[in-house]
């Protein structure tokens, strides 16, 4: 009896009859062969598959006997019996669309089979693209702007401003010094200025600024002014704006500069004005801020004639359109890794150099342009690491071997939508997700609710896609870790959790690692948001201090004294420290007080009582402004008074000011300030 193996892996069992044998002498031996089952590799695999299916069936039979809720949870947790993660099907539904979808493979790569030639074509194409890009940004970013008079006289340099910068005003409160001596000239002076695009929203103030007894926030910082059409002096095209108004925001409000492509204008300093009534602005900018009392400085806009302007118009709209157009063929024809990296790098430099630059540059100062490039490269290296992680964790699965039509229709447009965040999502009435900001900004709660509902809907859609692909369990664990980390960071004492654009994109994009249509849509927006956030604000911290959140707003300095008024001496003010406040600050530098009248510092000293009559005697310019305002009014004017603790020798070293108390001059009617600081 024995077992023999043949070359075909068939096993034969031989049974030998002991009574019939064959020996060496030639006798015959009778044997019986029994053919057994063939255990080839293929058959073994099929047997295992059948066993696996039987095990799966037994699991589902057990699941059927469980409670419905338990069955639902286990099915959600374990995923479908047969996971699937298919690319979008719509490109295959119609013949003409299928031809377009197959063109990169069937035609482009067939006609140009050499990978080296395709790569050389790509390099030449990108060089041509960059040359046009440079020709668009050069006249605005690098070439200095001038006004060239027709009479052949010397050309006049044009000053570049940002949307929220001052012209000849230093800042809020007492930044201009006593009687505004550090600012100016406040009259008889003209400037040629250049403003960028998007100043209809870029000229908003996001930190509260006191204007009289009002706190201005979440609106354009233009006080008074408005468009003027005068037959007496047709060169004057606006009413006077208070001189601490943002000039570029005011120019858009007056309609002399476009919010779409910026421009140049002439600013004429007009000196003191008796009041600044609110006016409705152009380009849907709303009403300006009203101020019903005098101020030492103002300016108006004048028409520019008798010459040619150069370098005035902001090309950002053309730059974005160019880069969107030139990036499309690469994304469509070439492998996804080329389209991804080329378009993300180009999108980043589009933001830095044109769409949303992090620094104000002045072409008359080449160092500022070099600084912009330096900042751009500084942020680019860590950004490339983030983009690599995003590619490996999510984008590669979606785009690699994906549908070219889906990439062009779904991923690419939403990518540029995210890049253009400053003209898309930033226009929503949401500044930051803090309790104070949500209360102060009109429409913020409604907008946040809408955004949250949209994100939740997208999350459910994408969670279902992950579940269908059988990876819900894995990503659920990942996002539980993310949420736990955010909760831990938000619990740190003295710090506030801040989810910036790039953080939001980086957290959400791994959950879009599927091949369906939803992944194309969501990934594009999220990658664009990452680029937008880093290009404009760098890798801002995920946790910030209370002082950083104030953004220069009052609330972090020494508390002001309590402002008093004595009816018996109705032209005098006094103040005293709160009993719980220290007499001097910890360093010992703040030893006196600073008094503002109509938002301009008029007194610095150690006295705790000040007479308005004495201030008028010591400051003839103040007395003249008050008298002129009285003559132009109905016999009374409002004086807005605020006081703070300050250093006598260096008044800019100060604490917070009180809110404004209102003294009606000259009859002495007093309205005490509201609680709080300014």
From Swiss-Prot:
Q: Where in the cell is it found?
A: Vacuole membrane
Q: What is this protein called?
A: Uncharacterized protein YIL067C
GO cellular component annotations of the record? fungal-type vacuole; vacuolar membrane
Answer whether the UniProt record assigns the keyword Kinase to this protein: no
The transmembrane residues are: 119-139, 245-265, 317-337, 340-360, 371-391, 405-425, 443-463, 475-495, 519-539
Reading the lineage from the top rank, the first entry is Eukaryota
Record's Pfam families?
Answer: LCCL
Native source species? Saccharomyces cerevisiae (strain ATCC 204508 / S288c) (Baker's yeast)
Q: Which UniProt keywords apply?
A: Membrane, Transmembrane, Transmembrane helix, Vacuole
